[in-house]
């Protein structure tokens, strides 16, 4: 049967080396179980490298260049200082696995301006390392300006995470346009990451035809693109026992979003925090979302402020569960429990 073709890898992989490389790299592009030089050399031609890595560099200018069809991530500045990416174009097929346009990881003092990104995965993505490795490195991505960029296809227009274990802070995003990205503004992480994301300011964003959320906070991220994961899988992870807060607990706080216009979306907004570490102190104001299939859903959040929000949808505009100190156009809801509450703006 056609559905069985992928499982019969020994038939359609071109060589034994390519099959071995694929099996060794189930965890993205990190080979597992490779112990000798001979084993490494056998699978090396079949790995998918990043197209451009810039590592531990200072005063970098990347300007006026076009990149196409990267095997994996396209642009990956890592641990750089004073880096400017200006008037760059990235074109990856929509189906390219892990085909991120830009992954700015653990960089300091960066300008991302006047670019066009068309990606097979996240477009403009802020990262700082994954799990224990990222926490040990301890290099937050910080002091970043993202301005006047256009994103065509992508899993997210502007994204933080999910690899944010070293922290993210002092990020300013303004005057960007997202045309048909799966999600507009996307914040994602999961238990085990650790790290703190704070001091994010987003202003003046225009979006058109967003299939899923215009704004998404998901701390139960399961490694799949928006829309690919079954609702049952997400609910299953959310029903697991609540662990203690440790260094492995990610935290998202002090995030301020304003002047957002979106014409066409799936769910307008989704705040999905952790029971042990809710999303805290997020302000969203001056937002217009037309033709949304669903409204706003908030779960596990504290100190969220919604002000001057206009959402055009057929159902309830605001569905809230497990939230504290929610402020909607000046009215404060000190506590809403698991039973939930339907509200309107």
Locate the predicted segments by residue.
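Extracellular/periplasmic carbohydrate-active domains that bind, remodel
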Residues: 3-345
């Amino acid at each position: 049967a056609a559905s069985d073709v992928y499982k019969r890898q020994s038939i359609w992989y071109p060589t034994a080396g390519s099959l071995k490389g694929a099996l060794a790299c189930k965890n993205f592009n990190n080979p597992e179980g490779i112990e000798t030089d001979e084993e490494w050399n056998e699978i090396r031609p079949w790995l998918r490298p990043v197209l451009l890595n810039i590592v531990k560099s200072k005063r970098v200018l990347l300007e006026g260049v076009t990149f196409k069809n990267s095997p994996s991530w396209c642009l990956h500045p890592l641990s750089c200082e004073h880096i400017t990416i200006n008037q760059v174009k990235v074109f990856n097929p929509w189906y390219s696995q892990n085909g991120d346009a830009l992954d700015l990881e653990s960089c300091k003092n960066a300008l991302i301006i006047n670019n066009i990104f068309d990606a097979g995965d996240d477009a403009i993505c802020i990262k700082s390392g994954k799990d224990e490795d990222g926490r040990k490195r301890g290099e937050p991505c910080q002091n970043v300006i993202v301005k006047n960029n256009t994103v065509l296809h992508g899993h997210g227009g502007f994204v933080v995470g999910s690899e944010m274990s070293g922290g993210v802070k002092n990020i300013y995003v303004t005057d960007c346009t997202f045309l048909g990205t799966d999600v507009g503004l996307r914040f994602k992480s999961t238990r085990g990451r650790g790290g703190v994301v704070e001091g994010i300011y987003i202003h003046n964003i225009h979006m058109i035809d967003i299939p899923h959320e215009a704004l998404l906070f998901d701390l139960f991220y399961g490694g799949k693109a928006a829309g690919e994961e079954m609702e049952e899988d997400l609910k299953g992870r959310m029903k697991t026992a609540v662990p203690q807060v440790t260094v492995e607990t990610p935290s998202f706080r002090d995030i301020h979003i304003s002047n957002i216009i979106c014409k066409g979306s799936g769910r307008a907004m989704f705040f999905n925090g952790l029971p042990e570490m809710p999303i805290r102190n997020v302000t969203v104001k001056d937002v217009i979302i037309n033709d949304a299939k669903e409204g706003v859903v908030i779960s596990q959040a504290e100190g969220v402020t919604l002000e001057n929000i206009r959402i055009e949808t057929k159902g309830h505009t605001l569905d809230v569960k497990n939230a504290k100190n929610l402020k909607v156009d000046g009215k404060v809801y000190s506590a809403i429990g698991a039973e939930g509450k339907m509200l309107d703006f």
